[in-house]
């Protein structure tokens, strides 16, 4: 072949780096906007995929999370890192669901295919 395949790896790496700035999902925990650039004070991303089979949409304003929507692929316990702020979680009907706090982690049960909305506590 006359074309070097290596430049495409750089493109994939750049895309992965941007994704890691917006969403991390290590150790079974979801971490929203862990390294949001100051140059992006508001925005949204839809259709992100996290480990453990989550689909995630993120919305942010003034450099902070305003809403995250999580759709799990399987029934499971979901863990969200809260960082400095605290979150609430609502189901598809808008009803707040029971969560337990474990340090900076917020844990709650999710059902496959249902949408859960995470918002900052006011």
List each language-model region with its residue ranges.
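Surface-exposed coil/turn segments at beta-strand junctions on protein surfaces, enriched
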Residues: 49, 73, 101, 109-111
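Generic recognition of long tandem-repeat/solenoid scaffolds
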Residues: 67-70, 105-109
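Short, well-ordered beta-strand segments enriched in hydrophobic/aromatic residues
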Residues: 56-58, 65-72
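Solvent-exposed beta-strand/loop surfaces of large extracellular or lumenal domains
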Residues: 86-108
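Tight coil/turn sites that cap or link beta-strands
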Residues: 111-115, 121
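Short, small-residue-biased leader/transition segments that mark boundaries at the very start
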Residues: 1-6
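Surface-exposed beta-strand/loop patches in extracellular or lumenal glycoproteins
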Residues: 69-85
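Catalytic cores of secreted or luminal carbohydrate-active enzymes
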Residues: 8-57, 61
């Amino acid at each position: 072949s006359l074309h070097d395949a290596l430049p495409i790896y750089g493109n994939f790496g750049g895309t992965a780096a941007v994704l890691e700035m917006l969403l991390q999902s290590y150790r079974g925990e979801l971490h929203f906007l862990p390294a949001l650039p100051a140059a992006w004070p508001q925005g949204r991303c839809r259709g992100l995929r996290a480990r453990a089979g989550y689909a995630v949409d993120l919305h942010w304003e003034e450099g902070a999370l305003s809403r995250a929507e999580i759709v799990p692929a399987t029934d499971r316990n979901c863990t969200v890192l809260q960082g400095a702020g605290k979150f609430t979680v609502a189901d598809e009907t808008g009803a707040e669901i029971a969560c337990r706090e474990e340090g900076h982690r917020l844990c709650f049960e999710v059902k496959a295919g249902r949408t859960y909305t995470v918002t900052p506590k006011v």
